[in-house]
Amino acid sequence: MALILDTGPLYASLDRSDADYAACRRLIENTSEPLVIPAPVLVEVDYWIHTRLHPGVLVALLDDIAAGAY
């Protein structure tokens, strides 16, 4: 079975200032299930990263996706 990530938890795992950052990082890092990011979620996360964070965060996320982390 796979863990399908939604925008909120995925974004929270990338934004250290988010109140749920630590919990979302733990969930993503410690699950044994394959992680899946639906295309619409990736589009939303891209928007939030560009509005609230730094484009380098998106580059790191895309690198992780290319490496098979998601």
Placement of each model-derived feature along the sequence:
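Short, intrinsically disordered, charge-balanced linker/junction segments flanking boundaries
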Residues: 62-70
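Histidine-centered beta-alpha loop that forms part of the nucleotide-sugar donor binding/catalytic region
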Residues: 40
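Short, well-structured N-terminal submotif of metal-dependent ribonuclease cores
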Residues: 1-37, 50-63
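Amphipathic alpha-helical segments within well-ordered protein domains
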Residues: 43-46
